[in-house]
Amino acid sequence: MADGKVIDIEQKVPDFREQRRRKSRRRLVLYISILAFFLLFVYYFQSDYSTVGHVDVYGTDMVDEKWVVESSGLTDGVSMWSYPFHEAVEELMEHPVIVSVEAERNWPRSITLYVDEYRTVGYLRSAENGAFYPLLNDGSILNQEEFQGSHVDEPLISGMDAHSELGRLAHELDELDEMVTRRISEVVHEPDQGEHHLTLYTTDGFTVYTEINDFASNMTAYPAVAIQLNPEEEGILHMRMTPYFEREGQEEEEIEIEE
């Protein structure tokens, strides 16, 4: 026999057997892992851990949070996986106050609803019953069943419930800086003074004449003008392109706006 390395088969057999045992153990571990995962998967979907346990609502002011949760259908027991969230969002957006809704899953069992509402710019007095109803920045008016409110920071509006320019006024109030809006306690439309004439009563004690057209731009300068006047002095403050103060029984006085 030629010189060469002789392979001892008997020595190799134990190595082959050990390799086969290791492969068998690995397959067994893999099968057990797959089975365990499958059982956990089935258990998860059969248990409460796969259902909604809590719903958080953010962004609501006029809409009741409880109503949002109930209308969304996201009650206890609803699946975190199969519930049609887009349908819940569409249902909520039927409410006249709501602009948009975003739903977010927060594992393991929580849902967060982010609600964006239209802004209330004033409270409109009804000529029919004298009640006040919220006027939104899109020009729509809410009835008592469509909102909740504990305080009124926006101006009261009278004589505008049947006016064709109500939507324009709502837009102008929305454009006006909130710091100025909060100083207006009441807005009164007086048609005998003009179709677009408005009389404002402010928290500073002034009576202001202005118009619906360019209301926001005209009233933006109000704080700078009011600080130059004595609220105890009787008269009318005209807030138009060029503001001036009309003292009672005296000539008009133009007011220079300080930058």
UniProtKB/Swiss-Prot annotation:
<keyword id="KW-1133">Transmembrane helix</keyword>
<feature type="domain" description="POTRA">
    <location>
        <begin position="50"/>
        <end position="118"/>
    </location>
</feature>
<feature type="transmembrane region" description="Helical">
    <location>
        <begin position="28"/>
        <end position="45"/>
    </location>
</feature>
<dbReference type="Pfam" id="PF03799">
    <property type="entry name" value="FtsQ_DivIB_C"/>
</dbReference>
<dbReference type="GO" id="GO:0005886">
    <property type="term" value="C:plasma membrane"/>
</dbReference>
<dbReference type="GO" id="GO:0043093">
    <property type="term" value="P:FtsZ-dependent cytokinesis"/>
</dbReference>
<comment type="function">
    <text>Cell division protein that may be involved in stabilizing or promoting the assembly of the division complex.</text>
</comment>
<dbReference type="InterPro" id="IPR013685">
    <property type="entry name" value="POTRA_FtsQ_type"/>
</dbReference>
<keyword id="KW-0812">Transmembrane</keyword>
<keyword id="KW-0132">Cell division</keyword>
<dbReference type="InterPro" id="IPR050487">
    <property type="entry name" value="FtsQ_DivIB"/>
</dbReference>
<comment type="similarity">
    <text>Belongs to the FtsQ/DivIB family. DivIB subfamily.</text>
</comment>
<dbReference type="InterPro" id="IPR034746">
    <property type="entry name" value="POTRA"/>
</dbReference>
<keyword id="KW-0131">Cell cycle</keyword>
<feature type="topological domain" description="Extracellular">
    <location>
        <begin position="46"/>
        <end position="259"/>
    </location>
</feature>
<dbReference type="GO" id="GO:0032153">
    <property type="term" value="C:cell division site"/>
</dbReference>
<dbReference type="Pfam" id="PF08478">
    <property type="entry name" value="POTRA_1"/>
</dbReference>
<dbReference type="InterPro" id="IPR026580">
    <property type="entry name" value="DivIB"/>
</dbReference>
<dbReference type="InterPro" id="IPR005548">
    <property type="entry name" value="Cell_div_FtsQ/DivIB_C"/>
</dbReference>
<keyword id="KW-0472">Membrane</keyword>
<feature type="topological domain" description="Cytoplasmic">
    <location>
        <begin position="1"/>
        <end position="27"/>
    </location>
</feature>
<protein>
    <recommendedName>
        <fullName>Cell division protein DivIB</fullName>
    </recommendedName>
</protein>
<keyword id="KW-1003">Cell membrane</keyword>
